[in-house]
Structure formats: C-alpha cells, structure tokens
C-alpha cells in the first residue's frame, strides 16, 4: 500500500511544471500562487481531519515549509532559465542523491544487501535523469536563450531546499496530516519574503497558480504518508518517477523542442527511471 501511495505524488508533482507553465507568470508569481493553493489545501484538510497541532508540529511544519519555498522557487527559476524538460531530470537526480543519502546516513533505512540493491537502483535512476537532460549539440535550432549559469545555481539551491523540506519532517516524526497546514504557512511566508519586492500579489498569474498549489498539496500529503510506511529513501525515489510526466508533457503539451537524438535520450532515460523506481519498490516490499 505504501508503494501505491508513493506513486500519487509522482503523478501530482510530475504535473506541476506543466500546470504552472499553462498558468503563466514569473518564478516568483508561480511560487507565491502555488503556496496560496497549498495553504487552501492545508486549511481544508485541517478542517476535515481536525488534527492536534502542538508547538512541535508548528515548528517543524513552518521550518519545512521555508525550506520548500527555497526548493520550489529556485526550481521555477531554473525552468525559466533552461526549460522544464531540462530542469526536471537534473533536479530529480540531485534530489534523489540528497534524499537517498539522508535516508541511509540519518535514518539508517538500509541494511545488509539493501545497501547494494538500493545504491544500484538510485544510480540507475540518476543515469536515467541525466540521459533525459542531454542535448544534441549539432541541432541548429538549439535555444540561444538558455542560461545554464543561472540554471545550475538555481538547481543547487533547489536541491538544498527540497532536501531540508523532507528531512525536517521525517526527523521530527510528526503526523503527516497534522503537519500539512503549518507547513503551508511556512511555504507562504518563504514565498512572500522571496517575492516581496516584485509585488506578485497584484498580478493575475499569481492567483491562477493557486491551482498548481492544490495539486501539489495532494502530492505532499501522500508523500509524507508514504514516508511513514516505506521510509524516506524509497518513498522519495518513487515520487520522483513523475519525471516521465513532466518531461514528455513539456515536449508534447508545452512545445519544448527536441531533436530525434534527444528524443532517444528521453525515452531511454525515462525507462531507466521507471526501472530504478520499480527496483526500489521491490526492495522495500
């Protein structure tokens, strides 16, 4: 059941870049709008479930949300710099490394042969992520607007933010449903701090991205439910299989250009991501 639960974030999060791309706006507008949607989801969940919110849950939730605002804001920045189909695979690989290391080193989730199987699975996942991001240097239509300096810096910061967002909650060992609303408060605070000078709250695109936040909220809830059942390393790795949705979606729905050679890279890379994810799930099962 935990494995099935972990696939829900893959679908939800794999759609985030596509939805935000359709909703439009700058990285700051998208991040603020998304956090508004996440807060709406968090408040609705709290109203239905009425979980107890202790000071510990508030602290962990807000800190986790602040980390998330760094992760998501910088990922949107990278998407603007180098495109969704290039950002998502690289970001996925970096997040998988960070969360697998956290699961093993901080939470001692793998034992004995699990080290070898888990390590091999993560390597396969990372190889798939890298393949999907490779470019065809002979393509005369390569975008001159890609800014890899900005993109890589944003991805490094994004990975730190995303790693902190999951590690804090897992380390705190708090109820998944209870932490969602405080976490959304932290996300909104972080987004407001980052975007304040641009006043994104006066732009319609910000409010359109509330939809993005609602979809993210669904994935977030099921992500932490899965972590409690099958561990951080496996749950997070499975959740990142949404790379297939975001990569192919950005090509076919948003029209990001790919040559035949790049499409071969994408197909092989996506297969490797699926194989690595399945291997991790079988290891835990």
UniProtKB/Swiss-Prot annotation:
InterPro entries (alphabetical): Sugar_transport
Record family assignment: Belongs to the GRP transporter (TC 2.A.7.5) family.
Residue ranges crossing the lipid bilayer per the database entry: 2-21, 31-48, 55-72, 112-134, 147-169, 179-196, 209-228, 233-255, 264-283
A Pfam family the protein falls into: Sugar_transport
GO cellular component term, pick one: plasma membrane
Species in which this protein is naturally found: Lactiplantibacillus plantarum (strain ATCC BAA-793 / NCIMB 8826 / WCFS1) (Lactobacillus plantarum)
Key words of the record: Cell membrane, Membrane, Sugar transport, Transmembrane, Transmembrane helix, Transport
GO molecular function: carbohydrate transmembrane transporter activity
Intracellular or extracellular location(s): Cell membrane
UniProt signal peptide: none
Entry protein name: Putative sugar uptake protein lp_2503
């Amino acid at each position: 059941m935990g494995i099935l639960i972990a696939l829900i974030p893959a679908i939800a999060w794999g759609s985030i870049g596509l939805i935000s791309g359709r909703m439009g706006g700058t990285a700051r507008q998208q991040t603020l709008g998304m956090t508004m949607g996440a807060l709406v989801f968090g408040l609705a969940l709290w109203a239905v479930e009425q979980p107890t919110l202790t000071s510990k849950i508030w602290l962990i939730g807000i800190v986790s949300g602040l980390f998330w605002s760094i992760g998501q804001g910088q990922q949107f920045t990278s998407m603007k710099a180098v495109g969704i189909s290039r950002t998502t695979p690289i970001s996925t690989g970096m997040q998988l490394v960070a969360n697998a290391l956290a699961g093993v080193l901080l939470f001692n989730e793998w034992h004995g042969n699990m080290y070898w199987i888990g390590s091999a699975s993560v390597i396969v996942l990372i190889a798939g992520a890298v393949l999907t991001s490779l470019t065809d240097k002979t393509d005369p239509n390569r975008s001159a607007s890609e800014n890899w300096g900005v993109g890589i810096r944003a991805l490094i910061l994004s990975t730190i933010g995303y790693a902190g967002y999951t590690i804090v909650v897992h380390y705190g060992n708090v109820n998944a449903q209870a932490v969602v609303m405080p976490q959304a408060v932290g996300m909104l605070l972080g987004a407001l701090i980052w975007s304040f000078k641009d006043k994104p709250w006066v732009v319609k695109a910000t409010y359109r991205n509330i939809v993005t936040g609602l979809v993210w909220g669904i994935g977030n809830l099921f992500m932490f439910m899965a972590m409690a059942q099958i561990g951080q390393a496996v749950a997070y790795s499975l959740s990142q299989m949404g790379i297939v949705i975001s990569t192919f979606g950005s090509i076919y729905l948003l029209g990001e250009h790919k040559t035949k050679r790049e499409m071969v890279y994408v197909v092989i890379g996506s297969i490797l991501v699926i194989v690595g994810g399945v291997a991790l799930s079988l290891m835990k099962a």
